[in-house]
Amino acid sequence: ALDTALSLGATAAAVEVSEEKGTCVTVRNQETESIEHTHDRDFGITVYLGKSKAVASSGDFRKVSILRTVKAALDMARYTTPDECNGLPDKDRLCTNPRQLDLFHPWDISIEEQVQKAVEAEKAALDVDKRVVNSDGAMVTTTIGSFILGNTEGFLHGYPFSDHSIDTSVIAEDENGMQVGSWHTSGVSSMDLL
């Protein structure tokens, strides 16, 4: 994408590429409501024509789609008002040795275990107070992925990551009416979940 952008006239460009895979289990009233498997990947290209800038993105990684996406960004940049602040960082300011941020902790959990954790979260929320009369459900999500950023100044770095969460939402009712409340915990490691 970067070479394509330069060959089509961009004065500079940056590309971000990401991919995520995960599962999300939802229960409602202690029964499994849905099980979703996700696999998303996309890229975004930022092009510069002098001090004019535009961004386009796609989830299609075929060469023809990359070319089409770069051309779309360049077409937009041609009609964008220049801004003196637009541009890539100076080459001497680019990070050449990025820190490892410890963001990757896959959660080895089966679908059945995710369902059980969602059931437990929902039950805990329902048991908080006798005024809690119904549930909007509980959800357990686990995701792993990777991110890469590169630019025409030679920067190319990325990192793997994980994201896990447990959510629940319940409805309480008394003589004054009804109220919805929710609880959420998330972290890069399942050990961070409350």
Regions found by a protein language model. Name each.
Residues 1-194:
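Active-site bordering "gate/hinge" segments
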